[in-house]
């Protein structure tokens, strides 16, 4: 059955919910990207080049914490789509919980879908994407999937960087109901990464944004090959998505803060503004909020020289409105008040 869409939206409201957790309000559709609210302890991880290969014990998601954030956002039934860029614990650990609470469908890697099945989500509720897909989300709104890579270096932390997918549904611990969160356990990256290019042909004109939650300058130009299948080089995949969408530039880039990556991506993306994410740490309590302000002189200097405005988040649940005229901050007073961020 074809899905009925409302009129095209004139804007999207974008909320940063910590790490690379984003909340998009696109007309009548609300989208949560990543949505990792549970905080696992740092001392649970060990091994590998990055120190995150294995865990000392399994962990269940913090359902109460996710529920609290969901309720603070209001109208939980509006959350109709969950996206994951990649499938490490700090991105997809709570995806199944959001889906249970909202009934929202999931789009991500095969690994994300298998993780969700382990948590009891029906297989048909999760769509596995490999890159190159153009998916209509709402009237006038298209999301293009860009196969991407993960941060790191194959010579230094291959278990974290190299593309790896799960091949079977992971088994939950019978005592705790939890999964093993290590990147060499139940939470590999899911075949590298998925970036998302959003294009809105709105009531007042066209606008767009690009989201990626990790990247490595080391091999952003090298094809991603998994199980004998070549998924293309990330930079070439981005060029293809931009070309297919008939975009010469985007209005906003949401991504990690790394100067070597920015120097490769900006010439392709030509963003008007940049919103840095995934700079606030992995292990601090969500309720404690941002502990130190964003600062990355290398990125900021390069972007300024390139004519790209830097939109600096200051606190969790900061919110912006993006439309054809650009991006600007808007108040999110009630949500912040409920979560204690005022």
Task: Provide a role label for each language-model segment.
Residues 13-16, 31-34, 142-149, 207-216, ...:
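Active-site-proximal beta-strand elements of phosphoester/diester hydrolases
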Residues 179-269:
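Active-site-proximal loop/helix segments of hydrolase catalytic cores
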Residues 93-99, 264-265, 270:
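Histidine-anchored nucleotide/phosphate-binding helix
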């Amino acid at each position: 059955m074809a899905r009925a869409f409302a009129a095209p939206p004139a804007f999207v409201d974008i909320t940063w919910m910590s790490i690379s957790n984003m909340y998009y309000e696109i007309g009548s559709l609300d989208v949560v990207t990543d949505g990792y609210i549970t905080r696992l302890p740092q001392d649970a991880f060990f091994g590998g080049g990055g120190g995150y290969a294995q865990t000392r014990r399994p962990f269940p998601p913090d359902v109460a914490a996710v529920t609290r954030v969901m309720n603070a956002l209001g109208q939980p039934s509006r959350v109709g789509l969950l996206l994951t860029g990649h499938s490490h614990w700090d991105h997809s650990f709570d995806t199944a919980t959001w889906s249970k609470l909202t009934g929202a469908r999931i789009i991500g890697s095969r690994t994300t879908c298998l993780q969700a099945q382990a948590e009891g989500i029906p297989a048909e509720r999760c769509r596995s994407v490999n890159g190159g897909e153009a998916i209509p989300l709402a009237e006038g709104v298209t999301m293009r999937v860009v196969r991407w890579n993960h941060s790191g270096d194959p010579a230094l932390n291959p278990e974290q960087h190299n593309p790896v997918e799960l091949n079977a549904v992971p088994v939950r611990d019978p005592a705790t109901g939890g999964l093993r969160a290590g990147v060499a356990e139940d939470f590999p990256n899911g075949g590298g990464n998925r970036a998302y290019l959003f294009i809105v042909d709105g009531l007042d004109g066209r606008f767009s944004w690009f989201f990626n939650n990790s990247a490595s300058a080391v091999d952003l130009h090298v094809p991603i090959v998994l199980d004998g299948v070549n998924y293309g080089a990330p930079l070439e995949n981005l060029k293809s998505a931009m070309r297919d969408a008939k975009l010469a530039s985007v209005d906003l880039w949401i991504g990690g803060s790394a100067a070597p990556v920015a120097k490769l991506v900006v010439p392709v993306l030509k963003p008007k503004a940049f919103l840095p994410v995934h700079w606030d740490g992995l292990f601090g309590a969500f309720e404690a909020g941002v502990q130190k302000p964003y600062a990355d002189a290398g990125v900021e200097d390069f972007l300024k020289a390139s004519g790209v405005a830097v939109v600096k988040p200051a606190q969790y649940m900061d919110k912006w409105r993006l439309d054809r005229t650009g991006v600007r901050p808007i108040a999110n007073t009630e949500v912040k008040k409920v979560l204690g961020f005022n």
